[in-house]
Amino acid sequence: MTETLLAGRLDLPFLSGGGQVGEMMRAHDWEGSPLGHPASWPQSLRSVVGLLLNSKFPMFVAWGEELGFLYNDAYAEILGAKHPAALGGHFREIWAEIWDDIWPLIRTAMAGEASYHENLRLIVSRKDYDEEAWFTFSYSPVRAEDGTVAGMFCAVHETTQLVLAERRVSGERQRLVDLFQQAPTFMAMLSGPDHRIEMANPGYMTWWAIARCSVEQSQRPCLTPWPRVI
């Protein structure tokens, strides 16, 4: 076995690289961790850890009955103030505030079934206060050498900024619609060379109906009517 301890740091091939978190793993005191010493980790766990440490995408693995927690640099940003204390800790203690929300998903993964969740809203506490956050992620079972499920792997992308941006755009559009609807005179928004009506208030539609009716009654040639409101 080539696994040795150099200058207080583990020299284990599967722990190579990994940026700041990789360096922390190599220097970590694993006594008391539910994961035990890395030299005793099974090959299945070593493979997952080697993968996540050398990925730029946020990832973590929870292992064993106590769900010992390991992650990479990208996921450390999601943890916020929970990092670095979360390294090697218990999954349930790290994310205690959302445990009731995610435990059914974890249980499903530990039963051998993967799952995918898009823009899941959670109330997290990672900056010394509670905040809304949204995540798109997958939970996948990880099997030990004997084929039993020994842990779960997660690849996750925080979508909070995207969700909030979509909310702002939706809110701004609704304010514009309200402005149109409440305008004391007729108002419309047209687009393109055909003057397609993008938005119009009741006053405008009433005026347009009257104007069109007047043209038809006069039997004069009429310009091509504007396309319907979309």
Where are the regions a protein language model picked out?
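PAS/LOV and related PAS-like sensory modules
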Residues: 3-27, 43-57, 169-195, 202, ...
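Per-ARNT-Sim (PAS) sensory domains and their PAS-associated C-terminal
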Residues: 6, 39, 43, 97-101, ...
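PAS-family sensory/regulatory domains
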Residues: 27-35, 77, 81, 85-100, ...
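Amphipathic alpha-helical regulatory segments at dimerization interfaces
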Residues: 47-51, 97, 105-109, 206-207, ...
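Sensory helix hotspots in PAS and closely related PAS-like folds
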Residues: 49, 60, 68, 76-77, ...
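Aromatic/pi-system hotspot detector in well-structured domains
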Residues: 60-63, 70, 95, 139, ...
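PAS/LOV sensory domain surfaces, especially short acidic/polar patches at coil-to-helix junctions
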Residues: 65-77, 81, 194, 198-209
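Sensory coupling linkers of modular signal transduction proteins
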Residues: 143-146, 150-177
